[in-house]
Amino acid sequence: MHRRATRRPIGASLLPKPFVFDQPLQSEAREAKMEFLRRVVAPWKSELRMNTALDLGCGVGYFSAMLQNAGLQVTAVDGRIENIEEARSRHPGVDFRVADAEDPSLGGLGTFDLVFCFGLLYHLENPFLAVRNLHALTGKVLLLESMVIPEEPPFLIIMDEGPVEDQSLRYISCYPSEGAILKMMYRAGFAHVYRFREMPNHEDYRPAMGRVRRRTVIAASGLALESQLLDVAAEPKLSGDLWNTDPTGIINKLRRFRSKLRRPRTRDRP
């Protein structure tokens, strides 16, 4: 039995249309994100004098078109050629290109006032490489949305990717915690990282009975952003020793006490 490949060639597809991006469940979540973005992008475009945008992991171009309609000159990138071909047919005014988010040569695209990366990071095998690329591409602000695991510390979980062929390039993906995203952003070189006070109005962005919040949106920049929408997010710090099974120190104290009891007593000289 042959072992399956760990990487799908760019452009390889086993899935006919319709695209996952067009499914009804995707539509509901996308509309919530669109409403959220209208509140965010328009003020930034004016206040920060944004003219250009990069949509990394653009799929079939829904958000690329929204950014274009907001008055930005948009370049959009996806790793799967069938997504790009479909996007070009739907939105001919956008510059769509095929590229891998984990490829260091991606920085050759230049810098963009707004870098937009929604729903991509957790599909990647090496998300930190992608975050480094995002930093190199960001001229003013990075706006990133991702699924997150329910952990506060900067942890990642390696998972098998499902058989959805228009979503990722590899069979292995890394799901980060929100803390991991913040940590990667700071270590990639962003001076300022922010959480949003209000998330998109969709169940994935809020906890419910029997379920924790699934997704988050983070902003990062070399500039200090002043906005009522944002709260500063500090770089997470791991405290203590992860390998320590005695955080209170009680076991070590007992060991020292037992050691003292075992020592032979010395008699005082007369």
Predicted ranges, named:
Residues M1-F112, D160, V212-R269:
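Conserved N-terminal segment of class I S-adenosyl-L-methionine
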Residues L120:
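Hydrophobic adenine-recognition pocket in adenosine-nucleotide-binding enzymes
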Residues L144-D166:
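Conserved class I S-adenosyl-L-methionine
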Residues F190-H202:
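Conserved S-adenosyl-L-methionine
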Residues V164-G179:
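Acceptor-substrate binding/catalytic loop of class I
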Residues F128-V141, V148:
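A short glycine-rich, Lys/Arg-flanked "PGG" loop and its adjoining helix->strand segment in the class I
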Residues F116:
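A conserved beta-strand element that flanks and buttresses the S-adenosyl-L-methionine
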Residues E203-G210:
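Short proline/glycine-enriched turn/loop segments at secondary-structure junctions
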